[in-house]
C-alpha cells in the first residue's frame, strides 16, 4: 500500500527531528511537511533530514494556520495520481511514532477492503515513560466497529494515531478555528467510514507541553467562543443521543471546564466579562444534550476559585443559575455559605492526605 503522512509545522524545532526519524514502515510511504511560516530552525532541520531520509517533502506557506497546512496536504493527495496514496495520516509535530507501531495500522488497513479508518491508542510522556491516554482506554482489543457501535470514538478529537482511507482527503479542516479545527472533519470521517478497525496498542506518543490557549483575557474569550461554535456545529451533526452526550461531555468537561479552571487560577478575581462568558456557555448547553454533573462542576469552578465577588456581579451569576433551575441565596448569605463550603472542602482535602 501507499501511505502519505501529513505533518503541519510551525516553530517546532524542539520536536520535529525526533518525529521524523521515528517514522518507519515496510510500506511505501511519503512524508509531507507543510510549514506555516516557522521563524526558528524548523525548516533548516527538515531540509537537513531531507538529505538523510528519502521520504520527506517540504512545502512552505506564509502565516498559515495548522488547519491551512493540513488542508494543503489533503489537497496534494487529491491532486496527485490516485495510485500514489491508498491512505493518509496527520501527525502532530510534537508527537512521535512509537517503535514498530506504524505497521500495526497499515496491516489492519490492508486486512479488509471495507476498512476506511484504523485507530490506535495514544500515549503521553510521564517522566520518560509512555502512558496510555485515559480517553483511549476503551480500546481494549483489536476489533472492527462503526461510530454507531462505538460512540466513545467521539472522545478522541485528535488526528494522532489514526489512519484514513485516501477517499477522505476530500474533507477539509475548518480554517476559521484555531484550536478545534479538526472536530468536524473527524466526525464526518467516522460517520462516512464503512468500518473502523481499532488497534489496542499505543501507536503515537505526545511530547507536547500544554501551553494553554487561555492564559490571558483575549485568548480566553476567543477560545470559549470557538468552543461554543464547534460544540453547536458538531452536536447538530450527531444523530444519536448517546453520541451527543459523549461528545458534549468531552467538550464541557475537558475543553471548557479545564480551561476555565486554569484561567481562573491565573485570574481569580471574578469579573463581569468572565461571568458573562460562563453564562453564555451555560445557556448554550441548554439547547442540546449534556451531562448534568458537568453543569454543576462548571458552577463549582466559578464559585470555589472565584474571588472578590461584588453584589452586581453576583446578581448576574445568581440570575443565570435561576434561569437553569438552580437557586442561589441573597448576596450576603452566598458569601457566608461559600466561606463555609470552602472551609469544609479544605478540611476534607487535608484529611485525605
UniProtKB/Swiss-Prot annotation:
Lineage of source species: Bacteria, Bacillati, Bacillota, Bacilli, Bacillales
Gene that produces this protein: tagX
Family matches, as CDD domains: Glyco_tranf_GTA_type (cd00761)
Source domain of life: Bacteria
One Gene Ontology term of the molecular function aspect: glycosyltransferase activity
Family statement drawn from the similarity comment of this UniProt entry: Belongs to the glycosyltransferase 2 family.
Gene Ontology annotations of biological process type: cell wall organization; regulation of cell shape; teichoic acid biosynthetic process
Keywords from the named record: Cell shape, Cell wall biogenesis/degradation, Glycosyltransferase, Teichoic acid biosynthesis, Transferase
Keyword Cell wall biogenesis/degradation tagged: yes
Listed name of the protein: Putative glycosyltransferase TagX
Claim: Cell wall biogenesis/degradation is one of the keywords in the record: yes
